[in-house]
């Protein structure tokens, strides 16, 4: 039978700290402490609404039954009743003598006759109550570790659920963008719209299936963990003999149990969207853009035809005028747009960093400033050779399947949108700024980036466009 000391400790765990009796209909509050239903209800009625143990606030409507504590109370009552009915303890099945010793080497409970046998006589022995207390403590340590691992597993389960929800939200947002893009391209592209939606939905099914499989594997691990925890709890509630039966094997299993690493899918969407014929449609809005030397940073060199820009090795001798950028290697297009639809393309071959887009005509030119839609810049950029971002606030990471050698920029002033296309990848849509607060004329924006020891010396080149169908 379990010794008196561990039983006393277990009774203390299920004692209500309000009435100081074993809990009746145990209820848990938000902080995790449990009390008799009647006791904690009285505390709430008196207007205290704070935990008697930790003084944290709680709400009566959030009380929840603690079945684990209720079961423990019932089991302890049964153990106590069994102890009263069997005062002489367990008897050895071989010698019919009282079992009161524990062989530490063999891990077996013995009577005094067994302890004197040739098999056990030279082994270290301790009283069974002492052994039970020792292994009770070891089981408690093992149980605490497993419960911690269970918490980690449950947190991972919650993370997977959140990723699934995130996937669904992103897919719905992407569907809307696809739909809007096809509407702009008129009804003759309706069939292509459906094809692209089917691709996206297939990606959704695949990713959710992957997350579902991961969730199922996690559920299996959680079930195995719960079964192991239940076995440890059952042993702790049983007699000393039941507790010690194969106890070393159980402890080894609990110590070796670890949550297996799971492959949780990324929530990043793959870029699957492009419209056949989009390049021809965009180029019907093509315009001839040239660079404005009056706005060029002194470290920039413009080509004679003002269609290329690169970073110089030395500062250029240029007038100090108000229009010129003085801190960053930037330059604006000479053209201004305050209505209509316009489109141009820029060659970025060999570049490891660049910024492209449009900005208000009156943006700040001097000193340091942020490049985002709040400050009048609607741009995307590449930095560190592979990091694409949109200049939102905060920045939006962009995931391109094919690195672009040519970027298309489409401005629809009346629709308040600026769209960017990867011409290298079937003119697939990279990003669209919507509901832009233009508030005045806009100008094309260019930044070839810093040279970075010669690795980013290639120029930005405005591409000639063949307009029409």
Swiss-Prot record:
Coiled coil stretches, renumbered: 128-245
Post-translational modification: Autoubiquitinated; does not lead to its proteasomal degradation. Deubiquitinated by USP4; leading to its stabilization.
GO cellular component: autophagosome; cytoplasm; cytoplasmic stress granule; cytoplasmic vesicle; nucleoplasm; nucleus; P-body; ribonucleoprotein complex
Main location, first listed in the record: cytoplasm
In-chain residues carrying the UniProt-annotated modification Phosphoserine: 266
Location of this chain's protein in the cell: Cytoplasm; Cytoplasmic vesicle, Autophagosome; Nucleus; Cytoplasm, P-body
SMART domains: BBOX, PRY, RING, SPRY
Pathway linked to the protein: Protein modification; protein ubiquitination
Chemical reaction(s) catalysed: S-ubiquitinyl-[E2 ubiquitin-conjugating enzyme]-L-cysteine + [acceptor protein]-L-lysine = [E2 ubiquitin-conjugating enzyme]-L-cysteine + N(6)-ubiquitinyl-[acceptor protein]-L-lysine
Broad enzyme group: transferase
Zn finger limits (RING-type): 16-55
Domain of life of the organism encoding this protein: Eukaryota
Alphabetical list of Pfam families matching this protein: PRY, SPRY, zf-B_box, zf-C3HC4
EC number(s) reported in the record: 2.3.2.27
GO terms classed as biological process: innate immune response; negative regulation of innate immune response; negative regulation of NF-kappaB transcription factor activity; negative regulation of protein deubiquitination; positive regulation of autophagy; positive regulation of cell cycle; positive regulation of protein binding; protein autoubiquitination
Role of this protein: E3 ubiquitin-protein ligase whose activity is dependent on E2 enzymes, UBE2D1, UBE2D2, UBE2E1 and UBE2E2. Forms a ubiquitin ligase complex in cooperation with the E2 UBE2D2 that is used not only for the ubiquitination of USP4 and IKBKB but also for its self-ubiquitination. Component of cullin-RING-based SCF (SKP1-CUL1-F-box protein) E3 ubiquitin-protein ligase complexes such as SCF(SKP2)-like complexes. A TRIM21-containing SCF(SKP2)-like complex is shown to mediate ubiquitination of CDKN1B ('Thr-187' phosphorylated-form), thereby promoting its degradation by the proteasome.
Domain notes: The coiled-coil is necessary for the cytoplasmic localization.
Complex formation: Homotrimer. Interacts (via C-terminus) with IRF8 (via C-terminus). Component of a SCF(SKP2)-like complex containing CUL1, SKP1, TRIM21 and SKP2. Interacts with CALR, CUL1, FBXW11, HSPA5, IKBKB, IRF3, SKP1 and VCP. Interacts with SKP2; the interaction with SKP2 does not depend on an intact F-box domain. Interacts (via N-terminus and C-terminus) with DCP2 (via N-terminus and C-terminus). Interacts with ULK1, BECN1 and with ATG8 family members, including GABARAP, GABARAPL1, GABARAPL2 and MAP1LC3C/LC3C. Interacts with TRIM21 and SQSTM1/sequestosome 1. Interacts with IRF3.
Name under which the protein is recorded: E3 ubiquitin-protein ligase TRIM21
Taxonomic source organism: Bos taurus (Bovine)
């Amino acid at each position: 039978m379990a010794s008196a000391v561990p039983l006393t400790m277990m009774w203390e765990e299920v004692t209500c700290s309000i009435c100081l009796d074993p809990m009746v209909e145990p209820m848990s509050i938000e902080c995790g402490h449990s009390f008799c239903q009647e006791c904690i209800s009285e505390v709430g009625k008196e207007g205290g609404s704070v935990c008697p143990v930790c003084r944290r606030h709680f709400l009566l409507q959030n009380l929840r039954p603690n079945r684990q504590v209720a079961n423990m109370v019932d089991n302890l009552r049964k153990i106590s009743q069994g102890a009263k009915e069997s005062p002489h303890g367990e008897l050895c099945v071989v010698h019919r003598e009282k079992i009161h010793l524990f062989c530490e080497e063999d891990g077996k409970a013995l009577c005094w006759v067994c302890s004197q046998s040739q098999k056990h006589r030279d082994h270290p022995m301790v009283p069974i109550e002492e052994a039970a207390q020792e292994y009770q403590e070891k089981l408690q340590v093992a149980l605490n570790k497993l419960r911690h691992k269970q918490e980690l597993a449950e947190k991972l389960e919650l993370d997977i659920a959140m990723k699934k929800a995130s996937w669904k939200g992103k897919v719905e947002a992407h569907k809307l963008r696809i739909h809007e893009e096809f509407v702009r391209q008129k009804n003759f592209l309706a069939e292509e719209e459906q094809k692209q939606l089917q691709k996206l939905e297939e990606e959704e099914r695949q990713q959710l299936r992957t997350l579902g499989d991961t969730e199922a594997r996690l559920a299996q691990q959680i079930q195995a963990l719960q079964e192991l925890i239940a076995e440890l709890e059952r042993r702790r509630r049983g007699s000393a003999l039941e507790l010690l039966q194969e106890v070393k094997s159980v402890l080894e299993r609990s110590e070796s149990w670890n949550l297996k690493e799971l492959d949780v899918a990324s929530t990043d969407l793959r870029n699957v969207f492009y419209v056949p014929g989009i390049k021809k449609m965009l180029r019907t809005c093509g315009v001839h853009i040239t660079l404005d030397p009056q706005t060029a940073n002194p470290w920039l060199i413009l080509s004679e035809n003002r269609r290329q820009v690169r970073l110089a090795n030395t500062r250029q001798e240029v007038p100090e005028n108000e229009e010129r950028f003085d801190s960053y290697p930037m330059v604006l297009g000479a053209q201004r747009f305050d209505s209509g639809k316009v489109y141009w393309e820029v060659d970025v071959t060999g570049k490891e960093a660049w910024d492209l887009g449009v900005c208000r005509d009156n943006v700040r030119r001097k000193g340091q400033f942020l490049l985002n839609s709040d400050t009048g810049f609607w741009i995307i950029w590449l930095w560190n050779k592979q990091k694409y971002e949109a200049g939102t606030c905060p920045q939006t990471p962009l995931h391109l399947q094919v690195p672009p050698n040519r970027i298309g920029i489409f401005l629809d002033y009346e629709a308040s949108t600026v769209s960017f296309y990867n011409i290298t990848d079937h003119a697939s849509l990279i990003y669209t700024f919507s509901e832009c607060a233009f508030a005045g004329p806009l100008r094309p924006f260019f930044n070839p980036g810093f040279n970075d020891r010669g690795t980013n010396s290639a120029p930005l080149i405005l591409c000639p466009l063949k307009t029409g169908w």
